[in-house]
Amino acid sequence: MIDSEGYRANVGIVITNDKQQVLLAKRLKQDSWQLPQGGIDFGESELDALFRELNEEIGLSFEHISILAKTPKWLRYDFPDYHIKHKQKPVCIGQKQVWFLLRLISNENNIKLNMHTQVEFDDWAWVDYWRPIEDVIDFKKPIYEDMLKALAPVLFNNQHKIPNQYLRPLKCSAIILDK
């Protein structure tokens, strides 16, 4: 679903374990790592999209996770020009995302990347909370930084110091959904 400004509505997913690490996934047949994310279909709620994408990309369902928080507003990023399909209508210039912070409450053996016909990832790893900023494609780095800074106080109970390299002003804070 592309809005009037050219942004595709999307949910982003930060899955954490009991060590406060996050699940980072490797794009199929690429040397590119990212957090799970996916589009919100027409008429679909953010939560419906979250659970659909969680199942399609990671093989998890509602009973495997606990929702901790979400970003309260859309976070946007623009595609580089080479990524924009100018002949496609409507033209999509980027994505606007709402991000959910989840905790895995089941065994990690439930994580299955090949549950659906359109497999997006071929590997995954638990990594340090801030690591996705370093590993994601360059044009997504600012949104990853904003999102992780917004969600960190929830995961770390306001006890975690933001690394110095990410100390630019925060654009939003998280809404706590579950405790």
UniProtKB/Swiss-Prot annotation:
It comes from the Bacteria. The keyword Hydrolase applies. One of its GO terms (cellular component) is cytoplasm. Keywords: Hydrolase. Its EC number is 3.6.1.-. A motif (Nudix box) lies at residues 38-59. One of its GO terms (biological process) is mRNA catabolic process. Residues 6-149 form the Nudix hydrolase domain. Gene3D superfamilies: Nucleoside Triphosphate Pyrophosphohydrolase. Transmembrane segments: none annotated. HAMAP family: Nudix_RppH. This is RNA pyrophosphohydrolase. Belongs to the Nudix hydrolase family. RppH subfamily. Accelerates the degradation of transcripts by removing pyrophosphate from the 5'-end of triphosphorylated RNA, leading to a more labile monophosphorylated state that can stimulate subsequent ribonuclease cleavage. Its cofactor is a divalent metal cation.
